[in-house]
């Protein structure tokens, strides 16, 4: 077993060796290095064929038509293209958008930008377990609502939203539905031939593909229109200009092919490991599970350890690569906005750790993690005056702290 142990698969994943090997064939003079838009010679044709194969592999995993897959630089761009693109195209119908407070920043900040441009956005608060109440969503829908954006799996707490039911509600009212599926694709089954989803964002690097590549699914029947955000040579049916990075696209395609093959068995394996981890730490005093095991992705476990400062816990767990909140927010000292939206107080939000497991996680690593967490929590609480006061029965909320 190698230390440190990587348990931050929701931030990024290593590229699968099979993917890396495939990508190497599309870069050098000996490989297929041509521009797929070069229609006048074999170098271009071969590159175009490689892109077509990858497009099919991605479409296969999610039950889409390959013509519905638009390549982007990643899920952040896909979210931007979907939300801005749909809002701008359909603004004559209305300027109201609905999303949730626990979406990824790429969705929230895109909506904030649209608010500055005159759109109105409703931010739904989830229930305590992170799941959106569909009655609240329905109540928020208006005649001028043109777009709903609610993610599939949350990147911090792993809860799974009922995208099938949300899709039905949107379709019945003629509202475009966008789903950020970054954390679910290749991990949970997605069948866009059945789901009433109009736009869906995908990433390469969360599922053992390369960074810097993603895709946006844009439904053809019934046809969904978006306005391009990147202009140029008219690539990707005019929706996203820019020379296609063949090596990255091939890598993403191969990663999605592997995911389709291994998904069923791998998810059972990860669910077993996640449950093993939770069962190993859940009897520690004052430990809280954030999210919902039953309605949760099999690879994410978010836990708060009361009376332990999250930062000091991460330092104590230096043999584990884990995060507090998401990679995007863990660089700041703000408590996670996702956990705050669930109703956690600052203290509990600050003392949260996200464990996210993946393809190369072993049982041995999980057992080591359990032992290390138990030891570290014990040691940190021995040093904590707050823990001592709690054990003495002092109500910490009633204390007036002096401000210096």
From Swiss-Prot:
Pyridoxal 5'-phosphate binds at residues 75-76, 155, 183, 203-205, 243. This is Cysteine desulfurase IscS. It comes from Escherichia coli (strain K12). It is found in: Cytoplasm. The gene is iscS. It catalyses: (sulfur carrier)-H + L-cysteine = (sulfur carrier)-SH + L-alanine. The active site is at 328 (cysteine persulfide intermediate). Treatment with N-ethylmaleimide inhibits sulfur transfer. Activated by ThiI and TusA. GO terms for molecular function: 2 iron, 2 sulfur cluster binding; cysteine desulfurase activity; metal ion binding; pyridoxal phosphate binding; selenocysteine lyase activity; sulfur carrier activity. PROSITE patterns: AA_TRANSFER_CLASS_5. The C-terminus (residues 376-404) is important for interaction with IscU. GO terms for cellular component: cytosol; IscS-IscU complex; IscS-TusA complex; L-cysteine desulfurase complex; sulfurtransferase complex. Homodimer. The homodimer interacts with IscU and TusA, other S acceptors. Each subunit of the IscS dimer contacts a IscU monomer. NCBIfam families: IscS (TIGR02006), PRK02948.1 (NF002806), PRK14012.1 (NF010611). InterPro entries: Aminotrans_V_dom, Aminotrans_V_PyrdxlP_BS, Cys_deSase_IscS, Cysteine_dSase, PyrdxlP-dep_Trfase, PyrdxlP-dep_Trfase_major, PyrdxlP-dep_Trfase_small.
């Amino acid at each position: 077993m190698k230390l440190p142990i990587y348990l931050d698969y929701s931030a990024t994943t290593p590229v699968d060796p099979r993917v890396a090997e495939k990508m190497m064939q599309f870069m050098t003079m000996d490989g297929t290095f041509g521009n797929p838009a070069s229609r006048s010679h074999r170098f271009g044709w071969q590159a175009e064929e490689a892109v077509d194969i990858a497009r099919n592999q991605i479409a296969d995993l999610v039950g889409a038509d390959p013509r519905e897959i638009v390549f982007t630089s990643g899920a952040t761009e896909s979210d931007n293209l979907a939300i801005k693109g749909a809002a701008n195209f359909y603004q004559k119908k209305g300027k109201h958008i609905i999303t949730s407070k626990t979406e990824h920043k790429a969705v929230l900040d895109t909506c904030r930008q649209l608010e500055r441009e005159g759109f109105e956005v409703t931010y739904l608060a989830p229930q305590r377990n992170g799941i959106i109440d569909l009655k609240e969503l329905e109540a928020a829908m208006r005649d001028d609502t043109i777009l709903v954006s609610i993610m599939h799996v949350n990147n911090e707490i792993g809860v799974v939203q009922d995208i099938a039911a949300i899709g039905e509600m949107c379709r019945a009212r003629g509202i475009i539905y966008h789903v950020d599926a970054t954390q679910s694709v290749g991990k949970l089954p997605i069948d866009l031939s059945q789901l009433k989803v109009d736009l869906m964002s995908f990433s390469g690097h969360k599922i053992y593909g390369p960074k810097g590549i993603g895709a946006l699914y844009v439904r053809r029947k019934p046809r969904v229109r978006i306005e391009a955000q990147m202009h140029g040579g008219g690539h990707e049916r005019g929706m996203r200009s820019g020379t296609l990075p063949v090596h990255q696209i091939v890598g993403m395609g191969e990663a999605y092919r592997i995911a389709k093959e291994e998904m069923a068995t791998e998810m059972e394996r990860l669910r077993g490991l996640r449950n093993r981890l939770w069962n190993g730490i859940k009897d520690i005093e004052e430990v809280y599970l954030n999210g919902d095991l039953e309605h949760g992705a099999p690879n994410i476990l978010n836990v708060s350890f009361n009376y332990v400062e999250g930062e000091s816990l991460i330092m104590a767990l230096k043999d584990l690569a884990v995060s507090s909140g998401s990679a995007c927010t863990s660089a700041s000292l703000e408590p996670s906005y996702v956990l705050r939206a669930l109703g956690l107080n600052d203290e509990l939000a600050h003392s949260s750790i996200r464990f996210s497991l993946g393809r190369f996680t072993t049982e041995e690593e999980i057992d080591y993690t359990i032992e290390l967490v138990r030891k570290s929590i014990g040691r940190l609480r021995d040093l904590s005056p707050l823990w001592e006061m709690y054990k003495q029965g002092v109500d910490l909320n009633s204390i007036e702290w002096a401000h210096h």
